[in-house]
Regions:
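Nucleic-acid endonuclease domains
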Residues: 1-42, 48-219
Length: 219
């Protein structure tokens, strides 16, 4: 927990140092920072490290690949008594993101291919054969993955579910479990990945804008 507070403090310091801002309406899960440049709003991922490698996210999956496709990165290094920063354009981060995406791709393909192959007999083997399944039956399968409103909305019988609808719920659960097991737990970006990136040690806001502008002009 203390580490999280320290990261938050460093990220806030980075926003001030580089003249960036956060859209507070997006909440904690929103974009880390934005940069306004020549009428454009540039989204940034902010990271800090004191150990060399850079941590990313708890459950890395296809949604992060899509989210980071056009994201710019700003990384603060606090190591061996030095403090410096490095900027990474979307193109500079693309190889690492693509490598991780390739690693999880077959697992997420399974999450799409496997659930439709489950049939009514498979569902009967889990819940028994019934003409109508209850809210409790559905919750036994999907647990907290559905809200109560979703459970009720999915009922296609009076206060219950038909066998076909319950099969759909079992398939949903199967897809969720495969996807959950397919995400990467906080993949680290090694220090060597940033070896040839330029350090920013002064005139932080100005230099960052120059680097972003140069990237956009050559994109």
């Amino acid at each position: 927990m203390a580490s999280n507070f320290q990261d938050d403090e460093r990220e806030q310091a980075m926003r001030m140092l580089f003249d960036l801002y956060k859209d507070e309406s997006e909440g904690r899960s929103g974009v880390d920072a934005y940069l306004d440049l020549d009428g454009m709003t540039i989204p940034f991922e902010l990271k800090t490290t004191s150990r060399g490698s850079v941590t990313t996210v708890r459950d890395f999956g296809p949604d992060h690949i899509e989210k980071w496709r056009d994201r710019h990165w700003l990384i603060g290094f606090f190591m061996q008594g030095r403090e410096y920063y490095k900027y990474g354009s979307p193109a500079m981060m693309a190889p690492w993101i693509a490598e991780k995406g390739k690693y999880i791709e077959p697992d997420f393909s399974l999450a799409q291919l496997a659930p439709p192959k489950l049939n009514l007999q498979d569902m009967y083997n889990i819940l028994g054969e019934k003409e109508r399944y209850t809210y409790e039956d559905a919750r036994y399968i999907q647990k907290r993955q559905y809200s109560k409103a979703t459970y009720l909305a999915r009922q296609d019988l009076d206060a219950g579910y038909s066998p076909q609808r319950m099969l759909e719920i079992v398939r949903d659960r199967t897809a969720y479990l495969i996807k959950r097991g397919s995400t990467l737990n906080n993949p680290h970006i090694p220090l060597s990945y940033f070896k040839n990136w330029a350090e920013i040690t002064e005139n932080h806001a100005l230099i960052l804008r120059q680097m972003v502008k140069a990237y956009l002009e050559n994109e």
